[in-house]
Amino acid sequence: MAPVKRPIAACFMLVLFSFGQLLSAQEKSGPCPQPIVTNDSRFRPGQVWQYTTRSHEKASTLTILKVESLPKQGVIIHIRVDKVRLRNCTGGPEPDKFQHMPFTRKVIERSVTKLVQENGVPEFKDGYDEWRKACGGVYTITVAEAINVGEETFRKNLGCPSTD
């Protein structure tokens, strides 16, 4: 089973980078601006939140990984999302988490509903480093909307029919 998960994980990472049209991009005319770690009055690394989920994922939660700021985007909240289900029409593994997703603070504010607990911060270095290397953007749509787009992209890359 483990050998199958590695290609799925690689495919899934590509999914995260393939819908950049929904992201507020960083300036790419020169080197990427260096994010500045920021303290926020409400959001802190390790917090686990309930959020407005997709209808079939009521148990899904998001975890705050890091809080930073960039000149054009303002405060960025990096999150992990657990207990999602990305449907796989091939019968293969179905990803159940997004390990790193950067959002504007405004979108996280609109998405979260209840602070559940505070834990340690799960590992997210690989996803974060890929985001930095790509001068990646920041989601400006809700968490649930981003998961919908991620699932559609995942399914399209597998050759699955659209769920529209």
Per-region residue spans from a language model:
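N-terminal secretory signal peptides
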Residues: 26-87
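Bacterial N-terminal signal peptides that target proteins for export
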Residues: 1-12
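Sec/Tat signal peptide C-region and signal peptidase I cleavage site
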Residues: 21-25
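Beta-strand-rich cores of mature extracytoplasmic or soluble domains
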Residues: 86-164
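Bacterial N-terminal signal peptides
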Residues: 10-20
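Hydrophobic alpha-helical segments and their boundary regions
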Residues: 7-9, 35, 116
